[in-house]
Amino acid sequence: MKFIIEYGCDGIGSEWLAIEAENLEKAEHYAYLSAFDYRDGYEGLHGVQNFAEFCEENELNEDYDESWEAYNIMIEEEIFYHVYEFDEEDELHLEVLEESEGRFFVV
């Protein structure tokens, strides 16, 4: 199946990509992971905190599992992703496909 995905992080922006996946669930999983990777690329920049900065700001000990859990919750709240079935009549979908050199990235 063919999809258009958008993924990103609050306060930074987003990316769009044309993908082909076996089903909607796999497309959603890929978009979710892409959002995490996108955010990770900005850690320490534009106000995106890394784990040490998060712990310092929230006065948490970096050695506790609870600190990691709180950090992961923060990340989940910052990232976003959307998956749309490809519609060849949708201008935005066609633009995304064109930016992908007319190809769907197989996931």
Describe each model-derived feature in a short phrase.
Residues 3, 24-27, 59:
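N-terminal cationic leader/targeting segments used for protein routing and processing
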Residues 36-107:
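Short, mixed-charge low-complexity intrinsically disordered segments
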Residues 23-42:
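A short, charged, amphipathic alpha-helix used as a generic interaction element across diverse proteins
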Residues 13-24:
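A short, exposed loop/beta-hairpin motif centered on an aromatic-Gly-Thr core
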Residues 1-14, 34:
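Short aromatic-glycine-(Arg/Gly/Cys) micro-motifs in beta-strand/loop hairpins
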Residues 5, 20, 74-76:
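Residues marking helix boundaries in flexible regions
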